[in-house]
Amino acid sequence: MDGFCDQQVPFMVPGKSRSEDCRGRPLIDRKRKFVDTDLAHDSEELFQDLSQLQEAWLAEAQVPDDEQFVPDFQSDNLVLHAPPPTKIKRELHSPSSELSSCSHEQALGAKYGEKCLYNYCAYDRKPPSGFKPLTPPATPLSPTHQNSLFPPPQATLPTSGLTPGAGPVQGVGPAPTPHSLPEPGSQQQTFAVPRPPHQPLQMPKMMPESQYPSEQRFQRQLSEPSHPFPPQSGVPGDSRPSYHRQMSEPIVPAAPPPLQGFKQEYHDPLYEHGVPGMPGPPAHGFQSPMGIKQEPRDYCADSEVPNCQSSYMRGGYFSSSHEGFPYEKDPRLYFDDTCVVPERLEGKVKQEPTMYREGPPYQRRGSLQLWQFLVTLLDDPANAHFIAWTGRGMEFKLIEPEEVARRWGIQKNRPAMNYDKLSRSLRYYYEKGIMQKVAGERYVYKFVCDPDALFSMAFPDNQRPFLKAESECPLNEEDTLPLTHFEDNPAYLLDMDRCSSLPYTEGFAY
């Protein structure tokens, strides 16, 4: 069993012996060692190049200030590829220390030359080729700087501000004044606050930050590379935001004015005319939309029929149309549509009591059914001379069938109604199971439904439908005008002087 290789399957290759397999092992082992050697050699060369690059970056970080120029990509690689810090010292919490995120980079210690490289490369804009930017180590001394292995090459900024590389930049503004060392009394609170190098060059000290909304917006875009900075979880109580958040905070006071302007856009003059508490144009400037809203009104037919007992307001109502709205009236006025159709050509219209208008909507013209009309006639003892109950259950007899037909014609505005037409309508109720014709007796009919159900359906809400009164004289079928002729005929356009103040005339055929 010792001679078998760990990957050999004996029954799959029966021709090979144990000795041959053992002799083939040294060749495989030599190949494996050769491959491993090549892999180790390649990886060593690869990582050797990376280590050389990293050493070059570290060497560049230790160059004196006047010769140092660190591009953006080098600062990114320095922070991302550098080993984690071994010792982290928590700084004192002061209001001025929250303005910068250099405390993240100061915790990296002496290995990086105390260069805050990442922050200033992301914050600073690209200078011209002839100028060299002011370097970030020109900050006040801090205990972290004093305890480091590599102290800053220059202790004060006024000496570094006089370097030849920074000479052309000094002509722009008073650079050394804001970067001078703080007084001894305030050094304990402001020692960890590095300042951006170009801030005194672009923002004078006497001008407020609110006057630079576009500059702050531009600085927020330049400081967006702060996102890849890895959060240091080892720092206790480190809840300070990143640097680009601090630089973009002056945008916040400038945000409410456009928001207020956006809310003010809703106060359109077209909307302000009806609001009682808002200033706006006078009401006469909005007459055209008011006229459109008045269009579906229904009182044009009532003004054309003078003898109809309409319950609409008339007279002085139309003269004050600018002060009131016509649709703010009683909703029961919209139940009437019975007095629109006249019955004579000469302008005589049927007289109609106003109680019919006060009823529920089922009493409108056309809604009263024939069986309901018959029950109403039977319920009134005054009609016993032409229709009455027979006394046998729900049977009733049309004593004068032509009179019943004539009254039904008055109710339905059909003066030519007769018993033949009425009897054909009654056959419809045979099929529906509402009434039947009593066999062997003429003009005798019978309701087949329950009496209580019959009267409850015929008189909803315990109110009897009001039937139309007798007309003055009999009319023929051809004497009745259709509704369309009535609307288009100018002979019926009466009381036009009362409607002159309205945007639309009453003669318009809707």
Curated annotation (Swiss-Prot):
Localization per Swiss-Prot or TrEMBL: Nucleus
Entry keyword set: DNA-binding, Isopeptide bond, Nucleus, Phosphoprotein, Ubl conjugation
Annotated positions of the Phosphoserine modification: S248
Highest taxon of the lineage: Eukaryota
Function summary: Binds to DNA sequences containing the consensus nucleotide core sequence 5'-GGAA.-3'.
Family affiliation: Belongs to the ETS family.
The protein, known as: ETS translocation variant 5
